[in-house]
Amino acid sequence: MEEKNIYQPYLMRVAAIIDETPDVKTFRLEFINEEEGKNFKFMAGQFGEYSVFGEGESTFCIASSPTREGYIECTFRKMGRVTKALASREIGDTIGFRGPYGNTFPIDQWKGKSLLFVTGGIALPPLRCVIWNALDLRDNFKDITIVYGARSVNDLVYKHELEEWGKRGDVKLITTVD
């Protein structure tokens, strides 16, 4: 099998958009080439280059869990030219994705241990992938505690997931606001 050119982006379809806050969005991206999607593998903690053709590319973590195949998710704050262009995309639009790149969380080494995740604001997306990875493999770990804070209630990302995690009987969730 021919190896993928790391400089050639995968073509991705924006399948879903969640407005997390007024300036933060989450995109669910599906591979336009289904075969590429079936063969795509990544590990919790890796990142990618997300591109809007004609505007440039920006680097974000892959915010979804590798246990959930067929799509990837990214969460970003609208800040500069590229993220503003990304934020203007609509469901069905095409963007580019290069990756996965970078180091990973050593989740296999954590088996049988208690896990503590501490994060704040827009720094939750890099941990979200490993949190969902651990929750999808829940029997492998002892206690799971998530401590998450933000400047205000309006700045909390993944509110729907925070609510879900808080209702689970097998996770301790602590949220704070300044």
Spans of features found by a protein language model:
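FNR/FR-type flavoprotein reductase catalytic core
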Residues: 5, 81-178
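Ferredoxin-reductase
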Residues: 2-93, 150-152, 178
